[in-house]
């Protein structure tokens, strides 16, 4: 059994419709100009011949059936079916090596070694990503990601407005419209044909397996995540409930997981929902669990998955859990446990969570990891030059070093070892000190009388190793201390925010929106952070306000509104709009329920009511009561903080329009 750490988020979304929305993430520009290796024509031909002869035996259990592969990968509604047959086809798995050919002129190259290495790659993956098309995607990645972000926001906005009317993929396609669906699939087809994405999405486990692709896309992870987000979102239009692309993305997320966090638990819950939807129809026959897993991945076998997987896949026995889930569901198909809108919200939440997880960061501090850092690369090159130059010194220079071979020559002061474990200096300076120490040690080792210096060199080499270990330990302790300070600071901020509310139940509802006084902070930083700064300043000024003559002194602390007060606020806004001072004046004259409130309090309550309707996708219901609610503004920071899609403020109603509505 596998221990899922945190699966409550996706489960709540699947059980409650329309509660999860997503935020738009800003994609940053990044470039990558790293050269990649290529293989020769002879190796390509050898691998093709081997793949053709062994494909029948090695891949018979893992390829999709002929009858299933003859169907289109993506099915649309009736009004766009002809377009699907003409432009969209299921991706055909290619067993050939589509790589750029280049004649190798390097001396002493062993062709047998290259052939065996490529044979090993052919045993892991079904189709090699064309390196030329991958390089083309590197150049266009940012533009493609921006276009994908726009299409995602457009589709999500339509779903947010019409979530009640969308009950299946067909109705979703109808809401989008024929032209929109056609544009989405043409854009997805371009990713396949132009950039070589034969499996209709991005596989981060594949990129991590091969250093050539990792070097290409190391700085382009966010744009790639945006492209993957788009491919997963349009797969929701698949009315066959197969959802091949979504299964691919979920399995790739599990394969590339390195740390045991709560994210992979959400992935397992979503995969179970996809399996239930796949086997929930009568038209889907029983299928082998291994074949079901491999049908949506570019890998040849389950053993190949153990080669490309991360730490979580093996430690948590993900493969066994997936096979047991597939077997139980295929033997006794369960009834769909979630409606289609809840399923869409769960998919969007999962894709958003996956965008925030880094998969292409090199976390190791080994020499291999430092090779990708420009400053470290210069230090290592200088170190190699010094070591190679010192070993080729003449006998005269060696004799000169011999005369200086004393205990002071190898002292920690001379070698600079007393400064290496200083955590205040940078890594580049530390590597420079190590380079200088090794330069002196190797120079002394080139002398003729090695018997006198080898023992000393060994001793101080041991001292150098201890200094490096001491530095690593000091840096680890320093990082842990900084992390503890950060956690303590966050705890203080949370306690300060919690103290602003008198009742625990009102914390989430009565969070104040951004006021005009916070505009300057909002321009310089994030609006959410500006809101928190405003709360802290408000708490600091609370003592001063008590000493002033405030007419609403008795209702300084927040309290829960009664139904009578909320109904009165609805009536006042319907009659008088957003004239808050006028509403308070009328309430005082008529001795109404809102007579004790101030203009700011009723304005905040009106914003909170509208935000609640926005979160539940019920704005049209609110506008049906009164069009004056369109003039109630909800700040962008409040929407970002509570994950509500931000809608621009509607211009005030014209006088003639208001008169016609009231009449």
From Swiss-Prot:
Compartments (UniProt record): Cytoplasm; Nucleus; Chromosome, Telomere
Disulfide-bonded cysteines: none
BP-aspect Gene Ontology terms: meiotic attachment of telomere to nuclear envelope; meiotic attachment of telomeric heterochromatin to spindle pole body; mitotic telomere tethering at nuclear periphery; protection from non-homologous end joining at telomere; telomere capping; telomere maintenance
The keyword DNA-binding is assigned to this record: yes
Signal sequence interval, chain numbering: none
GO terms for MF: double-stranded telomeric DNA binding; molecular adaptor activity; protein homodimerization activity; telomeric DNA binding
Cited InterPro entries: Homeodomain-like_sf, SANT/Myb, Telomere_rpt-bd_fac_dimer_dom
Main location: cytoplasm
CDD domains: SANT_TRF, TAZ1_RBM
Region called Disordered, residue ranges: 15-72, 389-412, 471-554
One term under GO cellular component: nucleus
UniProt entry tagged with the keyword Zinc: no
UniProt name for this protein: Telomere length regulator taz1
Designated gene of the protein: taz1
């Amino acid at each position: 059994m596998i221990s899922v750490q945190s699966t409550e988020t996706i489960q709540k979304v699947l059980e409650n419709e329309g509660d999860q929305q997503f935020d738009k993430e800003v994609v940053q520009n990044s470039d990558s100009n790293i050269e990649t290796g290529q293989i020769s024509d002879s190796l390509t031909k050898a691998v093709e011949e081997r793949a053709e002869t062994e494909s029948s035996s090695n891949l018979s259990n893992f390829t999709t059936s002929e009858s299933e592969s003859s169907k289109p990968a993506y099915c649309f509604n009736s009004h766009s079916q002809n377009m699907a047959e003409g432009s969209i086809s299921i991706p055909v798995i290619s067993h050939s090596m589509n790589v750029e050919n280049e004649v190798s002129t390097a001396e002493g190259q062993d062709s047998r070694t290259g052939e065996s290495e490529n044979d090993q790659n052919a045993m892991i993956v079904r189709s090699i990503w064309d390196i030329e098309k991958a390089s083309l995607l590197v150049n266009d990645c940012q533009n493609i990601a921006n276009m994908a972000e726009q299409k995602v926001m457009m589709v999500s906005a339509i779903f947010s407005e019409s979530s009640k009317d969308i009950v299946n993929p067909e109705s979703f396609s109808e809401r989008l419209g024929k032209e929109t669906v056609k544009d989405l699939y043409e854009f997805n087809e371009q990713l396949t044909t132009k950039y070589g994405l034969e499996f209709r999405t991005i596989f981060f486990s594949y990129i991590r397996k091969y250093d050539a692709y990792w070097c290409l896309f190391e700085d382009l992870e966010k744009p790639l995540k945006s492209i993957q987000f788009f491919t997963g979102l349009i797969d929701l239009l698949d009315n066959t409930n197969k959802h091949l692309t979504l299964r691919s993305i979920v399995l790739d997320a599990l394969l590339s997981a390195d740390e045991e966090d709560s994210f992979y638990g959400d992935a397992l819950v979503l995969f179970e929902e996809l399996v239930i939807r796949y086997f929930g129809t009568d038209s889907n026959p029983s299928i082998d669990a291994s074949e079901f897993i491999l049908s949506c991945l570019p890998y040849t076998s389950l053993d190949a998955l153990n080669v490309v997987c991360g730490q979580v896949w093996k430690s948590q026995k993900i493969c066994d859990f997936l096979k047991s889930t597939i077997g139980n569901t295929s033997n006794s198909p369960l009834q769909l446990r979630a409606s289609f809108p809840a399923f869409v919200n769960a998919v969007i939440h999962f894709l958003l969570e996956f965008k925030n997880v880094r998969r292409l960061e090199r976390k190791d501090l080994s020499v291999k990891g430092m090779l990708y850092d420009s400053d470290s690369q210069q230090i290592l090159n200088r170190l190699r030059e010094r070591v190679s130059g010192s070993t080729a010194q003449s006998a005269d220079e060696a004799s000169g070093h011999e005369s200086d071979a004393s205990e002071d020559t190898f002292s920690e002061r001379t070698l600079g070892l007393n400064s290496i474990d200083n955590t205040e200096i940078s890594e580049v300076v530390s590597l420079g000190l190590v380079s200088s120490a090794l330069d002196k040690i190797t120079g002394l080792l080139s002398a003729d009388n090695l018997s006198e210096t080898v023992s000393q060199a060994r001793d101080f080499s041991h001292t150098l190793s201890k200094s490096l270990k001491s530095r690593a330990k000091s840096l680890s302790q320093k990082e842990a201390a900084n992390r503890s300070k950060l956690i303590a600071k966050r705890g203080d901020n949370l306690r300060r925010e919690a103290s602003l509310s008198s009742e625990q139940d009102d914390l989430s509802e009565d969070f104040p929106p951004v006021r005009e006084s916070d505009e300057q902070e909002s321009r310089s930083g994030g609006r959410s952070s500006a809101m928190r700064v405003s709360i802290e300043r408000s708490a600091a000024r609370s003592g001063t306000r008590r000493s002033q003559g405030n007419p609403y002194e008795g209702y300084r602390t927040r309290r829960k509104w009664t139904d009578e007060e909320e109904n009165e606020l609805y009536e006042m806004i319907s009659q008088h709009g957003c004239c808050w001072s006028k509403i308070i004046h009328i309430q005082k004259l008529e001795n109404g329920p809102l007579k004790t409130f101030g203009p700011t309090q009723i304005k905040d309550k009106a914003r909170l009511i509208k935000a609640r309707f926005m979160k539940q996708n019920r704005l049209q219901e609110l506008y049906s009561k009164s069009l004056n609610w369109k003039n109630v503004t909800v700040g962008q920071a409040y929407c970002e903080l509570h994950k509500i899609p931000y809608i621009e403020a509607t211009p005030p109603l014209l006088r003639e329009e208001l008169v016609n509505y009231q009449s």
